[in-house]
Amino acid sequence: ERGYLLTVKLSRAYSNLAVLGDHGVHGTDGEVDEDLIRHAIDLLESVRTQGENDPYWNSRMGYSCLMAYRSAATAYEYAKCWLALAPDDPAAQKLVRDCEEYLEEEKALELDLKEREEIIRKETPDDVKGGICK
């Protein structure tokens, strides 16, 4: 039976393989192997009760979630836990800052999209609106 530490290290190996690829399979396209990253997260979930208060577990969960969901919201929660458990860790501080930047970018893109939709609504004649969206 695999212990806690081995499970977390195995998860890291799967996460690295998902992001970096196997001998350049992913090349430089930035794609993440979704099956492998999901498996990495599943491994971490299997030891959640032992890991929730472990800075390393939270770091691995934060990085893996950031890669898996391409959204910083979930990763940010784990990054904050990691930072709370290891406030002097520069890597934890960096992940928190990175997630905050990603969240700001997502928010700006969402606001930009809403503004564009509003402009289109205002500039589209009512008879065209009725013909497009019934």
Could you say what each language-model-derived stretch is?
Residues N16-T28, R70-A72, C99-P125:
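Alpha-helical linker/edge segments of TPR/alpha-solenoid repeat scaffolds
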Residues D29-D42, Y69-A73:
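Helix-turn-helix repeat elements of alpha-solenoid scaffolds
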Residues R2-G27, N53-M67, K94-E101:
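Amphipathic alpha-helical repeat scaffolds of TPR domains
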Residues R2-T7, E117-C133:
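N-terminal alpha-helical interaction modules that lie
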Residues A40, A75, A92, A108-D112:
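Solenoid-repeat scaffolds in large eukaryotic assemblies
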Residues G3, S46-V47, C81-W82:
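Canonical positions in the second alpha-helix
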